[in-house]
Amino acid sequence: MARGVNKVILVGNVGGDPETRYMPNGNAVTNITLATSESWKDKQTGQQQERTEWHRVVFFGRLAEIAGEYLRKGSQVYVEGSLRTRKWQGQDGQDRYTTEIVVDINGNMQLLGGRPSGDDSQRAPREPMQRPQQAPQQQSRPAPQQQPAPQPAQDYDSFDDDIPF
């Protein structure tokens, strides 16, 4: 029997600077809000209409560190992840729910366009940012003059010898 598919792809603008924190095990978690907009022409009035949807996006691991370092309010970004709904109890005892796009080791993030205006840093890379499929380095953040993190190998046939089944 086939499994279900839970995949979300968004292209939008970051609504505020990322919030990065670290879990007790040392893994990074970064939260952003992402605005996506669609526009259409109203058939009755002929006026151009626009609707903006806000999405909560949570990055985990190395992608969380990269998102926290490079994304800023106004950045345009491509995000690929999955939907996840969390439940917790508020201080009033009521159940609360939130649905988020989770971007983890199976996800992808790509910074689009240039740096947002007013950001005078020179840290924004121009190529896709994806979690490397190798052991983590001792250094948690690359210096701007270093080469970008290696991308996962595109030729998966070369890995056949390492698979035990």
Swiss-Prot record:
Biased composition (Low complexity): 130-144
InterPro entries for the chain: NA-bd_OB-fold, Primosome_PriB/ssb, ssDNA-bd
Gene behind this protein: ssb
Domain SSB: 5-110
Biased composition (Basic and acidic residues): 117-129
A Pfam family annotated for this UniProt entry: SSB
Motif Important for interaction with partner proteins: positions: 160-165
PROSITE patterns registered for this protein in UniProt: SSB
Known function: Plays an important role in DNA replication, recombination and repair. Binds to ssDNA and to an array of partner proteins to recruit them to their sites of action during DNA metabolism.
Any one GO CC term of the record: nucleoid
Name the record gives this protein: Single-stranded DNA-binding protein
Oligomeric and partner information: Homotetramer.
Annotated spans, Disordered: 109-165
Keyword Translocase in annotation: no
Keywords (A to Z) from UniProt: DNA damage, DNA recombination, DNA repair, DNA replication, DNA-binding
GO molecular function: enzyme activator activity; single-stranded DNA binding
Organism: Pseudomonas aeruginosa (strain ATCC 15692 / DSM 22644 / CIP 104116 / JCM 14847 / LMG 12228 / 1C / PRS 101 / PAO1)
Annotated HAMAP family: SSB
GO BP terms in the entry: DNA recombination; DNA repair; DNA replication
